[in-house]
């Protein structure tokens, strides 16, 4: 034992001796606390101690220090068998650990402790090895359990089993339905079944997909994606799991699409090929064009049965023996948007799709007159009404023309520089207004962004947009013009890292670099969750000296609005549902709170009877019975498929590992053992990623290397011995790392035989 180590141990013993009176006093206080257990008044000064005692029982690693001293005792005290909380000895625990170690040694054929077999390991080394095996096992297990719970909760936000739904509109009088009840459910053979496969009551807006089923006939409506949040590292989007449909492919008689937003068509390239060329696909011209654009991304493009529908012809499409469909034009933020009138043996089902009310639209007004005729002559037995914007009070306040006029004001007010407008690439009518405003002022327009250019091409083919003569130029040509003649329309309004606008900010764009004379217009609102990314982009623009104008901040520039929501406001819903007078009401397309508020509106304002309103979840089976009442009756299995940026599937287990790594990191140990002798032939290699920086952790790494030398100080030749060694190293290193850092990275021991 060297001098430094002797001094350290002596200091440790002095500290323990100094603490003994304090430890004894606290132990007596703990013993006396029971006198107050059955009284109404407890001493105030014991409150902190009681809380800390509870934390101790749960193995919390608290830093609270009553009286200015560590209530748990120093790590060195605990390592030497002294519990700082009450002064008791941990000899029993030490015996238990020794017994476990002896058992492990016997498994490996070890006839004693590694230190005994290695003369180079003295008593001091043995003590170090014992320290390597954590005496904070309870804390570590608690940490791992809480981490596992957090990781599972984060990775399974969209995993759908039997969702908790105790809403008074849940169809079970507010009681939570059980698995046993669902298994016992038997459908009415004459019922029309409405089954949301995705997009209903989930965490986020998207993944819309609904099935209408009658006996052996099914209609599938929409196939959308839901873009993943940052809680899902490496996952770009998710789509519905359609196992139920794959098990019933012969029953699917038609696939219908309400419109071309990605939350309604984004899963087409993954799902449509499963149905083959015989299943007819119905949608408007623009929507079909956008679906074909999606399908063109597939290497082996399948043959599909596309059918273009003109909603203004009021055509009744007989898709099966008992089911027919009529597309009804509804105003939205994209051309070709429709609601669906589905005629069934049990009455008319109206599915609204996405819609908004607008007094003076660019697009044709919603075909409410046709819906009035249907209500008058047939009635609506069940209405599925979207819920997205139900929390916005009043009526939709503006028109797309207002947005166009305000974009013109920007061009007038900032006439001497370039105007760069960022919006959603699907905002075809908005883009048309920008072209018109630029044409009036003698400005030229260039488009930037892959999706932007593709969508405009589809719109031109479907005759959904008019381009003024000699207004559009290529990007490489427009940069040659004076700044006051340049308008650029680009993607990136959501602060996407690799979108055009961000690349302009960072100087990574091939043609455009932001400069102080530029004016950037955000003709959009941040999608919930994207706000930090938008702020980051705005900061970058302002740092370059550019003028930034955002929708919703009219008080800063006196220019606005610059964007419209594509969804109806609260009073618009009241008017619409009142107009259609549905017998039964099923909110859909929205998060749970949106659907709940939608249901409350239908009951409290419109006056629909409570027992005719249901709030469903993905997978719930809603039956429309022959007597035109509705009920929930069981569930089907639903879920999600996850995909990355390359459109490749990502397994849930991989997501969990990524989350764990992002929080705790990876620690890899590579042991190289001779095939002949079975002994370690080189210093173990240690690799740390997203955990600790090795150059700053020499003491910890030295301790781990010493542990590994002792642990491998015998011949390891058979595979069972290698397997046991891996497990022991993994467990012990995890404890060592937790003792030193409070974290439990994924420990990967690798044993190479050479």
Where do the model's predicted regions map?
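His/Asp/Glu-rich metal-coordinating catalytic cores
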Residues: 152-256, 261-480, 499-513, 532-536
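Flexible glycine-/small-residue-rich
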Residues: 329, 344, 490-492, 671-675, ...
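Hard-cation-handling environments
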Residues: 392, 396-700, 705-719, 726-727, ...
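Extended hydrophobic secondary-structure segments that form protein cores and membrane-embedded regions
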Residues: 307-309, 383, 489, 615, ...
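Intrinsically disordered, low-complexity RNA-associated tracts
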Residues: 1-179, 183-186
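Short glycine-rich phosphate-binding loop at a beta-alpha junction
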Residues: 282, 586-587, 748
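C-terminal tails and terminal domains of large nucleic-acid-associated
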Residues: 3, 719-754
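Conserved hydrophobic residues forming the short capping helix/wall of the S-adenosyl-L-methionine
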Residues: 295, 602, 737
């Amino acid at each position: 034992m060297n001098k430094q180590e002797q001094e350290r141990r002596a200091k440790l013993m002095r500290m323990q001796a100094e603490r003994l009176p304090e430890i004894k006093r606290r132990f007596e206080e703990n013993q006396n606390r029971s006198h107050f257990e059955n009284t109404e008044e407890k001493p105030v000064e014991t409150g902190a101690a009681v809380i800390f005692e509870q934390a101790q029982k749960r193995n919390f690693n608290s830093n609270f220090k009553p009286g200015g001293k560590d209530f748990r005792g120093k790590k060195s005290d605990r390592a030497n068998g002294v519990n700082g909380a009450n002064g008791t000895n941990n000899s029993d625990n030490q015996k238990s650990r020794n017994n476990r170690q002896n058992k492990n040694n016997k498994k490996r054929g070890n006839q004693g402790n590694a230190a005994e077999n290695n003369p180079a390991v003295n008593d001091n080394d043995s003590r170090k090895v014992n320290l390597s095996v954590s005496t904070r096992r309870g804390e570590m297990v608690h940490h791992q359990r809480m981490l596992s719970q957090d990781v599972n909760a984060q990775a399974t936000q969209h995993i759908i089993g039997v969702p908790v739904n105790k809403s008074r509109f849940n169809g079970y009088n507010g009681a939570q339905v059980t698995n046993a009840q669902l298994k016992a459910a038997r459908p009415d053979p004459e019922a029309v079944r409405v089954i949301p496969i995705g997009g209903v009551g989930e965490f986020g807006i998207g993944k819309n997909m609904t099935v209408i089923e009658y006996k052996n006939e099914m209609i599938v409506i929409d196939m959308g994606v839901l873009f993943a949040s940052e809680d899902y590292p490496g996952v770009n989007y998710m789509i519905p799991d359609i196992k139920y449909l794959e098990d019933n492919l012969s029953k699917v008689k038609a696939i219908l699409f309400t419109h071309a937003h990605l939350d309604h068509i984004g899963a087409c390239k993954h799902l449509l090929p499963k149905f083959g060329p015989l299943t007819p696909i119905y949608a408007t011209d623009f929507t079909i064009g956008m679906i074909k654009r999606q399908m063109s991304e597939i290497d082996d493009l399948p043959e599909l049965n596309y059918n273009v529908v003109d909603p203004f012809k009021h055509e009744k499409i007989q898709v099966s023996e008992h089911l027919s469909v009529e597309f009804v034009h509804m105003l939205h933020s994209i051309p070709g948007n429709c609601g669906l009138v589905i005629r069934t043996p049990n009455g008319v089902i109206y599915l609204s799709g996405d819609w908004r009310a607008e007094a003076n639209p660019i697009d044709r007004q919603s075909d409410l007159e046709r819906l009035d005729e249907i209500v008058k002559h047939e009635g609506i037995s069940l209405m599925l009404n979207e819920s997205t914007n139900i929390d916005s009070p009043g009526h939709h306040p503006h028109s797309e023309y207002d947005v166009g006029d305000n974009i013109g004001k920007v061009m007038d007010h900032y006439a001497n520089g370039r105007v760069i407008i960022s919006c959603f690439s699907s905002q075809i009518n908005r883009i048309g207004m920008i072209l018109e405003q630029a044409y009036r002022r003698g400005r030229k327009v260039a488009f930037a962004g892959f999706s932007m250019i593709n969508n405009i091409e589809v719109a031109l083919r479907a005759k959904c947009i008019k381009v003024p003569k000699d207004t559009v130029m290529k990007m490489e040509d427009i940069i040659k013009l004076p700044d006051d003649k340049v308008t650029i329309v680009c993607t990136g309004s959501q602060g996407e890292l690799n979108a055009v606008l961000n690349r302009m900010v960072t100087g990574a764009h091939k043609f455009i670099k932001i400069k102080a004379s530029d004016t950037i217009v955000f003709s959009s609102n941040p999608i919930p969750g994207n706000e930090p990314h938008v702020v980051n982009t705005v900061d970058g623009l302002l740092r370059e000296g550019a003028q930034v104008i955002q929708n919703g901040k009219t008080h800063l520039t006196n220019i606005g609005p610059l964007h419209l929501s594509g969804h109806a406001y609260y009073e618009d819903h009241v008017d619409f549902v009142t107009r259609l007078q549905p017998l039964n009401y099923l909110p859909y397309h929205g998060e749970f709170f949106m659907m709940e508020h939608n249901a409350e509106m239908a009951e409290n304002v419109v006056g629909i009877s409570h027992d005719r309103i249901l709030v469903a979840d993905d997978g719930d089976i809603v039956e429309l019975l022959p007597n035109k009442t509705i009920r929930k009756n069981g569930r089907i299995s639903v879920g999600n498929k996850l995909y990355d940026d390359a459109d490749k599937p990502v397994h849930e287990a991989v997501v969990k590992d990524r989350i764990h790594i992002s929080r705790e990191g990876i620690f890899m140990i590579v042991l190289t053992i001779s095939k002949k002798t079975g002994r370690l032939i080189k210093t173990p290699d240690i690799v740390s990623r997203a955990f600790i920086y090795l150059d700053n952790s020499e003491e910890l790494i030295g301790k781990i290397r010493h542990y590994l030398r002792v642990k491998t100080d015998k011949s390891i030749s058979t595979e069972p011995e290698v397997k046991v060694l891996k497990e022991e190293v993994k467990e012990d290193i995890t404890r060592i790392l937790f003792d030193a850092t409070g974290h439990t990275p994924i420990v990967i021991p690798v044993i190479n035989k050479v």
